[in-house]
A protein has these predicted regions:
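Positively charged, low-complexity terminal tracts
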Residues: 1-204
Length: 204
């Protein structure tokens, strides 16, 4: 049976993860300090499905490299249509490395058919993305972690790809997103021809 694509993604203002280091304003009398001070380039996109949700947001590595985080979380009760809550306290988070970011961008923008990003952190977290034509297949997993699997609408995937492309270009002063797209396209062609990247594992 075919999986129903997830609902269209949209920007959601959700407080960042504990492992994100956005500065918080000093508390003043009676003021609400729940919302962190985010950089002007911060963007967060979400896609919600029947069993889990996926989210991409802009981030920076400890070395200051502009990249994206991929987060996934299970739905609290998939059998209750009225329950729209997702358990972000049980989420899986992966931050794309300097070398992974252009490959993820290539997959999300239709330049590579799939990719696998693994061995992240102590739990050996893994992200797989496959362009299936009608939609994109997303999967996160890891040692001792809940596996999150869902189809993501093509429109959402291209929104994610545009975010990743913009972050990639931001690392190179004066590089336009158009030029960055040309670089990533050339990279994707060579990686595909020479087998220089990890494709997603074949689903059985």
């Amino acid at each position: 049976a075919h999986q129903r694509p997830m609902q269209a993604g949209h920007v959601q203002d959700r407080s960042p993860s504990p492992d994100q280091s956005f500065a918080r304003p000093e508390q003043q009398g009676g003021e609400d300090i729940d919302k962190p001070v985010r950089p002007d380039w911060f963007l967060q996109l979400n896609t919600y499905g029947g069993k889990c949700a996926f989210q991409l947001e802009t981030s920076q590595t400890k070395d200051g490299w502009y990249t994206v985080n991929i987060e996934s979380a299970p739905r609290e009760n998939p059998n209750d249509p009225s329950n729209k809550r997702y358990l972000w306290n049980k989420k899986t988070v992966l931050q794309m490395t300097k070398s992974e970011l252009p490959i993820l961008t290539a997959v999300l923008l239709g330049l590579l058919p799939s990719a696998r990003f693994d061995n992240h952190g102590q739990n050996f977290k893994c992200l797989e993305v496959i362009n299936q034509g009608k939609n994109f297949f997303f999967k996160t997993s890891g040692s001792g972690l809940i596996m999150h699997v869902a189809p993501v609408p093509t429109v959402d995937a291209f929104l994610y790809g545009s975010m990743a492309l913009t972050q990639y270009a931001r690392n190179f002063n004066g590089l336009s997103t158009e030029s960055a797209m040309d670089v990533i396209s050339r990279l994707a062609n060579q990686l595909f021809d020479q087998g220089g990247y990890k494709p997603a594992e074949v689903r059985k």
